């Protein structure tokens, strides 16, 4: 049984990109000093990426006016996958933000994926 056959899930990967917009000098601030704007593209950079999600933790936090649910998953990717910090992975219609990937013995990637949902 190969490692590739254990990656039974499929997800779409979106790389975080700097938004190239028409910047003009505003209020006397030079364009080079303006904070960059980042966003995810509409189309995935990688479609149907083989992976495997395992739930790491889940917590519910009661705040003053609402409830927040934090979920984290440990996600496995093959070593050939192009995975970066702050990528968005969409698995079964749910979006997760990927944290710093770790390459395990030059064999595969392990990444923590986080999801935060607020309910009113």
Swiss-Prot record:
InterPro entries: DUF3599, XkdH-like_sf
Domain of life: Bacteria
Pfam families to which the protein is assigned, alphabetical: DUF3599
Similarity remark: To B.subtilis XkdH.
Protein name: Uncharacterized protein YqbH
Organism of origin: Bacillus subtilis (strain 168)
């Amino acid at each position: 049984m190969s490692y590739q056959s254990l990656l039974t899930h499929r997800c779409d990967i979106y790389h975080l990109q700097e938004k190239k917009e028409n910047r003009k000098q505003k209020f006397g601030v030079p364009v080079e000093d303006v904070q960059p704007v980042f966003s995810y593209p509409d189309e995935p950079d990688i479609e149907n990426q083989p992976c495997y999600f395992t739930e790491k933790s889940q917590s519910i936090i009661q705040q003053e006016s609402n409830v927040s649910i934090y979920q984290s998953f440990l996600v496995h990717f093959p070593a050939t996958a192009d995975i970066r910090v702050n990528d968005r992975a969409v698995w079964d219609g749910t979006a997760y933000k990927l944290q710093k990937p770790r390459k395990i013995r030059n064999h595969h990637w392990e990444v923590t994926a986080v999801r935060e949902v607020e309910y009113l």
